[in-house]
Design a protein with these regions (language model features):
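ATP-binding/phosphotransfer module of carbohydrate and carboxylate kinases, centering on a glycine-rich
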Residues: 1-57, 67-70, 89-97, 112-121, ...
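Phosphate-binding/catalytic loop of phosphoryl-transfer enzymes
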Residues: 57-59, 65-164, 268-270
Length: 270
């Protein structure tokens, strides 16, 4: 039995996991404006509501850069006070339970590899589309973090007049002074501009998938995050863009591209 913590953009979730299922969950808005210690106290209190003597491990999914070996969290964007938090050490000292801390997208792909669309494959890439873009990599059945825990930061690669994140996340809608939610509603009503915007997102995402295939050559790519819930609006344009001028067409026919259907990925993969 283990306990998992998901530090989302706005909410903090703590769940107890048994046999790959969340059996108890507490959730509340994260005290994002609190001091380092105030946020930690929120952690401690919520963990205390869920933990039992049978819990053998605590796993934490963090939306930031993490030193996986040391369990140190750096520069959490939505929590300004968290510049360098030795989270593994603090939780192990407080609860006496072995703790691991990892980037949330690594947790996402780990969950998909074990329980979701990546089950049965050895080489998996998972990407999440939301306010930003992240990627997690499983190779030979292990999460690959790189020498300095920076593997998978494909969002930072140059693209057009910026980088891929600016064109494959909600930042693209920001360029149009709108939101994905608004454009989804308009597209459903037949608005041609909104439909074109979702197709443009799909086009850029197809180019990002080309990068993933060229660099990682996975068996399966799994797409998750809030924007992925609108996959039916951009999937066709995405696949057309992926095939356009791709140098190894046979690779596209072999790779599986799936949209995540797994709930509580970050909790299950932490």
């Amino acid at each position: 039995m283990r306990l998992s913590i998901d530090m989302g953009g706005t909410n903090l979730r703590v769940g107890r996991i048994e046999n790959g299922k969340v059996v108890k969950l507490v959730q509340e808005p994260c005290n994002a404006k609190g001091t380092e210690e105030e946020v930690l106290e929120q952690f401690y209190r919520m963990i205390g509501e869920v933990i039992t003597p049978e819990v053998e491990r605590i796993g934490v999914a963090v939306p930031s850069v993490v030193d996986y070996e040391q369990g140190i969290v750096y520069d959490v964007m939505n929590i300004p006070s968290w510049k360098e938090v030795h989270l593994k050490e603090k939780l192990e000292t407080r609860f006496g339970v072995k703790t691991t801390v990892d980037n949330d997208v690594n947790c996402f792909v780990n969950a998909e590899y074990q329980f979701g669309a990546g089950k049965g494959y050895n080489h998996v890439v998972g990407i999440t589309l939301g306010t930003g873009v992240g990627a997690g990599i499983v190779t030979n059945g292990q999460v690959y973090r790189g020498a300095n825990t920076g593997a998978g930061e494909i969002c930072c690669l140059p693209y057009r007049d910026g980088n891929y994140e600016e064109y494959t996340s909600s930042q693209l809608f920001n360029k149009w002074n709108t939101t994905g939610k608004d454009e989804a509603e308009k597209a459903d009503q037949g608005d041609e501009t909104a439909i074109a915007r979702w197709n443009e997102l799909g086009y850029h995402l197809g180019k990002l998938l080309q990068v993933i295939l060229y660099t990682y050559d996975p068996e399966v790519i799994i797409i998750g995050g809030g924007i992925a819930q609108s996959s039916f609006r951009f999937e066709k344009a995405m696949m057309e863009s992926l095939r356009e001028n791709f140098q190894y067409p046979h690779e596209i026919e072999r790779v599986k591209i799936a949209f995540s259907e797994l709930k509580d990925c970050n909790l299950l993969g932490a």
